[in-house]
Amino acid sequence: MIGKDYFCKNYFNMDLSKILSISGKPGLFKLVGEAKSNIIVESLIDGKKIPAFSHERISSLHEISIYTHGEDLPLYEVLKNLYTLQQGKAVDNPKKMDGKSLKSLFEQVAPDFDEEAVYASDMKKVFTWYNLLLEKDLLDFSEEDENNSTEPTEEEGVEPEK
């Protein structure tokens, strides 16, 4: 069975595994290199390259999911839903949205989200990330051409679904 990492990297023409969130630092970062004791990241906001160390809380966007009342919803699904809802346009200034507006918009892109576990600050962060990824042209939800699919075959070690 194909895992969600494969789905995220190959079903859509984008790779969120190299886009990082670093706790305590604004915006998102692109992984650009590795060193012995750290990684080198480039800010998507200002383009500056900085080191990020193992003691910092670093999360790849493809690892992030939204708490729901059922199975957690991967962030890329929320971003895709938001892209579709907004028709490829940015969300109007998420930092100035009130709680009711945030919740209303978030319910449209993650209908079953857990209201006790997902805070307004989380919603603002998702909308801000969406705007930043959109601005930097890093959101591509077009599906790959079936003829050019990079989906692994049985010979490559992936068993067919039963």
Regions picked out by a protein language model, each given a short descriptive name:
Residues 71-75, 98, 102, 119-125:
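Helical mechanochemical/support elements of P-loop NTPase systems and associated helical scaffolds
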Residues 6, 29, 67, 113, ...:
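Aromatic side chains
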Residues 110-144:
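Positively charged, low-complexity, intrinsically disordered RNA-binding extensions
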